[in-house]
Amino acid sequence: MNRTVAAIDIGSNSTNLLVVDATGNELVREVNVTALGEGVARTGVLSQAAIERTLKVIEGYARVVASHAADLHITGTAACRMAGNTNEFFAKVKAATGSDPRLLSADDEARLAWHGAVASLPAVEGNTMVIDIGGASTELTVGTPQGEIVDSVSMPFGVVTLTEAELHSDPPRAEELSNAISMVGDAVDNAAIERPTLGGVSRVVGVAGSIVTIAAVELGLREFDSSRLHGMALTKDAAEDVFRTLATERLADRVHNPGLPVERAGVIVGGCCILVAIMRRLGLDNITVSTHNLLDGVVSAARLTGQGGKP
């Protein structure tokens, strides 16, 4: 494909934009927390407030896409899979952008996120696992150095849904944190038993907002710096340290941590619980952080095929 390509990822916690020119150079990358998945696990529908704030961001993105005359590809993930009114929401997205959103299956989401996360990292011998912590689901995906997906599991919790289900106090009580970590850990244990192909990897890569934020807090970044975060080794000890700090602070104090965007402060402890539980149960000493993600996978597939993520 020799045209500028744009992708909008309508996630359960954030709505994101990537625009890439005909030579593959990144022109625009934006992230906005819209919490589309807020309450969906309880109600089974996307709330009107969540729809309105997400559409407001998408309308702004549509203007950016139009200014670059880009081919636009829009995807929806876990919250949209869960909700009974997704068709109504997608109709509004199409009206705002002129493009039909595509509802990704869990397998497609995992595949595109894996390719997006790994493509810009140095090659390694052996398989790579990608941990993708979203707003309403978490994927563990293993692929080969040749880019073949070996196996993937999607677990039915993310930072929004885990926070809503388990972390009710400010700061969360020890019992709440323990329950959240146990729930995630049990799911990881079951996945490891049922999917032995998830083991024996050479590298583990962490992707999406929570993991990038945990890394940014560990570095104490006052401004987002992809050059310091992308490819960074985040150790288990560092992840545990960030978890202990953020989980014991009230929200009003937590927001002052360098590296933590205010809009993520309410759910970041849930993200810490998920990452720490995964690293504990899989015995991971460290992971490699990737600031590239599902968006990059969608754009790459679109540039290769012109079919919006269907290589």
Where are these regions (language model features)?
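N-terminal amphipathic/basic leader segments beginning at the initiator methionine
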Residues: N2-N16, G24-E26
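Helical "lid/coupling" subdomains associated with nucleotide-phosphate turnover
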Residues: R3-V5, V19-A22, A35, G39-H68, ...
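A short acidic Gly-Thr/Ser loop motif
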Residues: D9-S14, I131-S137, G158, V207-I211
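Short glycine-/small-residue motifs
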Residues: R29, E139
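A structural signal for short, well-ordered beta-strand segments
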Residues: E30-T34
